[in-house]
Protein backbone atom coordinates (compact mmCIF):
# COMPACT_ATOMS: atom_id res chain seq x y z
CA UNK A 1 0.00 0.00 0.00
CA UNK A 2 1.39 3.37 -0.94
CA UNK A 3 2.07 5.91 1.76
CA UNK A 4 -0.25 8.43 0.17
CA UNK A 5 -3.35 6.25 0.64
CA UNK A 6 -3.69 6.71 4.43
CA UNK A 7 -3.29 10.46 3.93
CA UNK A 8 -5.97 10.38 1.25
CA UNK A 9 -8.32 8.43 3.49
CA UNK A 10 -7.84 10.96 6.27
CA UNK A 11 -8.58 13.89 3.98
CA UNK A 12 -11.59 12.07 2.57
CA UNK A 13 -12.86 11.38 6.08
CA UNK A 14 -12.71 15.07 6.91
CA UNK A 15 -14.61 15.93 3.75
CA UNK A 16 -17.32 13.38 4.52
CA UNK A 17 -17.64 14.69 8.05
CA UNK A 18 -17.89 18.23 6.71
CA UNK A 19 -20.72 17.14 4.45
CA UNK A 20 -22.93 16.79 7.50
CA UNK A 21 -22.63 20.43 8.49
CA UNK A 22 -21.52 22.51 5.53
CA UNK A 23 -23.35 23.71 2.41
CA UNK A 24 -22.38 22.28 -0.95
CA UNK A 25 -20.36 25.33 -1.92
CA UNK A 26 -17.94 24.64 0.92
CA UNK A 27 -16.63 21.47 -0.74
CA UNK A 28 -14.76 23.42 -3.40
CA UNK A 29 -11.15 23.57 -2.30
CA UNK A 30 -9.73 27.07 -2.64
CA UNK A 31 -8.17 27.41 -6.07
CA UNK A 32 -4.41 27.61 -5.86
CA UNK A 33 -3.28 30.34 -8.23
CA UNK A 34 -0.29 28.81 -10.01
CA UNK A 35 0.98 29.06 -13.58
CA UNK A 36 0.03 26.17 -15.84
CA UNK A 37 2.78 24.71 -18.03
CA UNK A 38 1.30 24.22 -21.49
CA UNK A 39 4.59 24.66 -23.35
CA UNK A 40 4.67 21.13 -24.75
CA UNK A 41 2.22 18.24 -24.84
CA UNK A 42 0.85 16.03 -22.06
CA UNK A 43 1.07 12.24 -22.25
CA UNK A 44 -1.22 10.07 -20.13
CA UNK A 45 -0.52 6.45 -19.24
CA UNK A 46 -2.07 3.92 -16.85
CA UNK A 47 0.03 2.96 -13.81
CA UNK A 48 0.37 -0.79 -14.37
CA UNK A 49 2.31 -1.34 -11.13
CA UNK A 50 -0.49 0.23 -9.08
CA UNK A 51 -3.12 -1.82 -10.90
CA UNK A 52 -1.16 -5.04 -10.32
CA UNK A 53 -0.96 -4.37 -6.58
CA UNK A 54 -4.48 -2.98 -6.06
CA UNK A 55 -7.22 -5.49 -6.85
CA UNK A 56 -9.42 -7.84 -4.88
CA UNK A 57 -12.23 -10.30 -5.64
CA UNK A 58 -14.86 -10.39 -2.88
CA UNK A 59 -18.56 -10.28 -2.09
CA UNK A 60 -20.23 -7.00 -1.14
CA UNK A 61 -23.72 -5.78 -0.35
CA UNK A 62 -25.09 -3.01 -2.57
CA UNK A 63 -27.72 -0.59 -1.31
CA UNK A 64 -30.54 0.50 -3.59
CA UNK A 65 -29.93 4.17 -2.75
CA UNK A 66 -26.24 4.17 -3.77
CA UNK A 67 -25.49 6.24 -6.86
CA UNK A 68 -23.24 3.60 -8.41
CA UNK A 69 -26.10 1.10 -8.09
CA UNK A 70 -28.51 3.46 -9.82
CA UNK A 71 -26.14 4.70 -12.51
CA UNK A 72 -24.54 1.30 -13.18
CA UNK A 73 -27.77 -0.67 -13.34
CA UNK A 74 -26.68 -2.92 -10.46
CA UNK A 75 -29.38 -4.91 -8.69
CA UNK A 76 -29.42 -4.17 -4.94
CA UNK A 77 -28.19 -7.01 -2.74
CA UNK A 78 -25.10 -9.19 -2.49
CA UNK A 79 -22.75 -9.62 -5.46
CA UNK A 80 -19.24 -10.97 -6.06
CA UNK A 81 -17.12 -8.23 -7.63
CA UNK A 82 -13.57 -7.34 -8.63
CA UNK A 83 -12.38 -4.04 -7.16
CA UNK A 84 -9.27 -2.24 -8.42
CA UNK A 85 -7.37 1.06 -8.32
CA UNK A 86 -6.50 3.11 -11.39
CA UNK A 87 -3.72 5.69 -11.56
CA UNK A 88 -3.24 7.90 -14.62
CA UNK A 89 0.17 9.61 -14.57
CA UNK A 90 1.07 12.44 -16.92
CA UNK A 91 4.54 11.60 -18.28
CA UNK A 92 4.50 14.35 -20.92
CA UNK A 93 6.40 17.64 -20.99
CA UNK A 94 3.34 19.81 -20.26
CA UNK A 95 0.44 19.88 -17.83
CA UNK A 96 -3.01 18.62 -18.68
CA UNK A 97 -5.17 21.65 -18.01
CA UNK A 98 -8.92 21.18 -17.58
CA UNK A 99 -9.77 24.11 -15.35
CA UNK A 100 -13.33 24.77 -14.22
CA UNK A 101 -15.99 22.18 -15.19
CA UNK A 102 -18.66 24.88 -15.09
CA UNK A 103 -16.99 26.66 -18.00
CA UNK A 104 -16.96 23.47 -20.06
CA UNK A 105 -20.64 22.89 -19.35
CA UNK A 106 -21.43 26.48 -20.37
CA UNK A 107 -19.45 26.04 -23.59
CA UNK A 108 -21.15 22.69 -24.28
CA UNK A 109 -17.80 21.33 -25.48
CA UNK A 110 -18.55 17.69 -24.63
CA UNK A 111 -15.98 17.22 -21.85
CA UNK A 112 -18.43 17.01 -18.92
CA UNK A 113 -22.01 15.95 -18.27
CA UNK A 114 -24.19 16.38 -15.19
CA UNK A 115 -24.79 13.33 -12.97
CA UNK A 116 -28.23 13.68 -11.41
CA UNK A 117 -27.63 11.21 -8.57
CA UNK A 118 -24.22 12.52 -7.51
CA UNK A 119 -25.25 16.13 -8.24
CA UNK A 120 -21.92 16.95 -9.83
CA UNK A 121 -20.24 16.73 -13.21
CA UNK A 122 -18.76 13.59 -14.74
CA UNK A 123 -16.13 13.35 -17.45
CA UNK A 124 -17.18 11.85 -20.74
CA UNK A 125 -14.78 9.29 -22.29
CA UNK A 126 -12.13 9.71 -19.60
CA UNK A 127 -11.30 6.02 -19.10
CA UNK A 128 -12.47 2.58 -20.17
CA UNK A 129 -12.52 -0.32 -17.69
CA UNK A 130 -12.64 -3.80 -19.25
CA UNK A 131 -12.45 -7.36 -17.91
CA UNK A 132 -11.29 -9.67 -20.69
CA UNK A 133 -11.54 -13.44 -21.08
CA UNK A 134 -8.19 -14.23 -22.78
CA UNK A 135 -9.58 -17.45 -24.30
CA UNK A 136 -12.90 -16.33 -25.77
CA UNK A 137 -12.09 -12.62 -26.07
CA UNK A 138 -15.36 -11.70 -24.35
CA UNK A 139 -15.28 -8.30 -22.64
CA UNK A 140 -17.16 -7.06 -19.58
CA UNK A 141 -17.19 -3.36 -18.77
CA UNK A 142 -17.47 -1.34 -15.58
CA UNK A 143 -19.85 1.60 -15.41
CA UNK A 144 -17.48 3.94 -13.55
CA UNK A 145 -17.42 7.54 -14.76
CA UNK A 146 -14.53 9.92 -14.16
CA UNK A 147 -15.42 12.76 -11.83
CA UNK A 148 -12.51 15.01 -10.95
CA UNK A 149 -8.97 15.21 -12.37
CA UNK A 150 -6.41 16.13 -9.69
CA UNK A 151 -2.74 15.93 -8.73
CA UNK A 152 -3.02 13.20 -6.08
CA UNK A 153 0.49 11.74 -5.99
CA UNK A 154 3.84 12.20 -7.66
CA UNK A 155 4.70 9.55 -10.22
CA UNK A 156 8.05 8.07 -9.27
CA UNK A 157 8.81 6.73 -12.76
CA UNK A 158 8.38 10.13 -14.45
CA UNK A 159 11.22 10.47 -16.98
CA UNK A 160 11.68 14.22 -16.52
CA UNK A 161 12.43 16.52 -13.56
CA UNK A 162 10.10 15.58 -10.73
CA UNK A 163 10.58 18.43 -8.27
CA UNK A 164 7.43 20.40 -9.08
CA UNK A 165 4.69 21.02 -6.55
CA UNK A 166 1.06 20.07 -7.16
CA UNK A 167 -1.17 22.53 -9.01
CA UNK A 168 -4.58 20.92 -9.39
CA UNK A 169 -6.50 20.14 -6.21
CA UNK A 170 -9.95 21.71 -6.70
CA UNK A 171 -12.84 19.70 -8.15
CA UNK A 172 -15.32 22.52 -7.97
CA UNK A 173 -19.09 22.00 -7.90
CA UNK A 174 -22.17 23.17 -9.71
CA UNK A 175 -21.84 26.96 -9.67
CA UNK A 176 -18.55 26.79 -7.72
CA UNK A 177 -15.33 27.17 -9.75
CA UNK A 178 -12.89 24.28 -9.89
CA UNK A 179 -9.29 23.98 -11.03
CA UNK A 180 -8.69 20.55 -12.50
CA UNK A 181 -5.85 18.90 -14.38
CA UNK A 182 -2.77 16.71 -13.98
CA UNK A 183 0.65 18.32 -13.73
CA UNK A 184 3.53 16.71 -15.56
CA UNK A 185 5.13 14.16 -13.25
CA UNK A 186 1.93 13.77 -11.20
CA UNK A 187 -0.84 11.17 -11.24
CA UNK A 188 -4.56 11.18 -10.62
CA UNK A 189 -5.81 8.08 -8.78
CA UNK A 190 -9.21 6.44 -8.48
CA UNK A 191 -8.77 4.18 -5.45
CA UNK A 192 -10.30 0.72 -5.36
CA UNK A 193 -12.73 1.58 -2.54
CA UNK A 194 -14.55 4.25 -4.53
CA UNK A 195 -17.98 3.83 -6.01
CA UNK A 196 -17.96 2.18 -9.42
CA UNK A 197 -14.38 0.85 -9.18
CA UNK A 198 -15.46 -2.74 -9.83
CA UNK A 199 -16.74 -5.38 -12.20
CA UNK A 200 -19.89 -7.29 -11.18
CA UNK A 201 -19.31 -11.03 -11.63
CA UNK A 202 -22.73 -12.66 -11.17
CA UNK A 203 -24.69 -10.83 -13.86
CA UNK A 204 -26.17 -8.40 -11.34
CA UNK A 205 -25.53 -5.47 -13.66
CA UNK A 206 -27.19 -7.02 -16.71
CA UNK A 207 -23.99 -8.38 -18.27
CA UNK A 208 -23.26 -12.11 -18.60
CA UNK A 209 -22.01 -14.03 -15.57
CA UNK A 210 -18.20 -14.14 -15.23
CA UNK A 211 -17.20 -17.79 -14.57
CA UNK A 212 -14.25 -18.58 -12.27
CA UNK A 213 -10.92 -18.59 -14.07
CA UNK A 214 -8.10 -16.42 -15.37
CA UNK A 215 -8.86 -12.96 -16.74
CA UNK A 216 -7.25 -9.67 -17.75
CA UNK A 217 -8.13 -6.28 -16.30
CA UNK A 218 -7.57 -3.81 -19.13
CA UNK A 219 -7.67 -0.07 -18.44
CA UNK A 220 -7.58 2.58 -21.17
CA UNK A 221 -7.18 6.24 -20.27
CA UNK A 222 -8.42 8.94 -22.66
CA UNK A 223 -9.80 6.26 -25.00
CA UNK A 224 -10.58 6.91 -28.62
CA UNK A 225 -14.24 7.25 -29.56
CA UNK A 226 -16.32 7.92 -32.65
CA UNK A 227 -18.55 10.98 -32.09
CA UNK A 228 -22.27 10.32 -32.23
CA UNK A 229 -25.17 12.65 -32.94
CA UNK A 230 -23.24 15.88 -33.26
CA UNK A 231 -20.91 15.10 -30.36
CA UNK A 232 -17.87 17.43 -30.39
CA UNK A 233 -14.47 16.08 -31.42
CA UNK A 234 -12.04 17.90 -29.15
CA UNK A 235 -8.87 16.16 -30.37
CA UNK A 236 -8.70 14.11 -33.57
CA UNK A 237 -6.53 10.99 -33.50
CA UNK A 238 -3.76 11.63 -36.06
CA UNK A 239 -3.49 7.96 -37.05
CA UNK A 240 -7.10 6.77 -36.95
CA UNK A 241 -9.56 8.63 -39.17
CA UNK A 242 -12.83 9.52 -37.48
CA UNK A 243 -11.54 8.71 -33.98
CA UNK A 244 -11.43 11.43 -31.32
CA UNK A 245 -9.99 11.89 -27.82
CA UNK A 246 -11.13 14.22 -25.09
CA UNK A 247 -7.64 15.30 -24.03
CA UNK A 248 -4.60 16.27 -26.13
CA UNK A 249 -1.57 13.97 -25.92
CA UNK A 250 1.74 13.46 -27.67
CA UNK A 251 1.14 9.70 -27.80
CA UNK A 252 -2.19 7.90 -27.78
CA UNK A 253 -0.61 4.46 -28.24
CA UNK A 254 0.58 4.08 -24.63
CA UNK A 255 -2.79 4.62 -22.96
CA UNK A 256 -3.51 0.98 -22.06
CA UNK A 257 -2.38 -1.20 -19.15
CA UNK A 258 -3.29 -4.83 -18.48
CA UNK A 259 -2.86 -7.16 -15.51
CA UNK A 260 -3.74 -10.84 -15.15
CA UNK A 261 -5.97 -11.94 -12.28
CA UNK A 262 -7.62 -15.17 -11.15
CA UNK A 263 -11.28 -15.16 -10.13
CA UNK A 264 -12.12 -17.94 -7.62
CA UNK A 265 -15.42 -19.78 -7.36
CA UNK A 266 -16.38 -18.47 -3.90
CA UNK A 267 -14.29 -15.43 -2.88
CA UNK A 268 -16.31 -14.68 0.27
CA UNK A 269 -16.38 -11.34 2.04
CA UNK A 270 -12.72 -11.47 3.06
CA UNK A 271 -11.82 -11.78 -0.59
CA UNK A 272 -8.91 -12.96 -2.69
CA UNK A 273 -6.15 -10.79 -4.14
CA UNK A 274 -3.39 -8.36 -3.13
CA UNK A 275 -5.83 -6.19 -1.14
CA UNK A 276 -7.36 -9.02 0.92
CA UNK A 277 -6.35 -7.51 4.25
CA UNK A 278 -7.74 -4.05 3.56
CA UNK A 279 -10.78 -2.70 5.41
CA UNK A 280 -14.19 -3.15 3.81
CA UNK A 281 -15.31 0.50 3.99
CA UNK A 282 -16.31 1.96 0.66
CA UNK A 283 -15.72 5.66 0.09
CA UNK A 284 -17.54 8.16 -2.09
CA UNK A 285 -17.07 9.18 -5.69
CA UNK A 286 -13.48 10.49 -5.48
Where do the model's predicted regions map?
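Extracellular/luminal regions of secreted and cell-surface proteins that mediate adhesion/ECM remodeling
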Residues: 28-286
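Bacterial N-terminal signal peptides that target proteins for export
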Residues: 2-12
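Bacterial N-terminal signal peptides
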Residues: 11-24
Amino acid sequence: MRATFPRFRAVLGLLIAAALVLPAAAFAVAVKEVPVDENGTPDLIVDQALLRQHWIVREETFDATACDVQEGGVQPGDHPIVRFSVGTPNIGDADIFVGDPNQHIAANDGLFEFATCHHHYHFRHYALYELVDPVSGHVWRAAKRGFCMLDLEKYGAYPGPNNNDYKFRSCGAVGVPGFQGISKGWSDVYWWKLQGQYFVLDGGDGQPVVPPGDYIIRITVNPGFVPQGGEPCRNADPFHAGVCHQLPESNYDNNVAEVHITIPDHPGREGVGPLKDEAANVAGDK
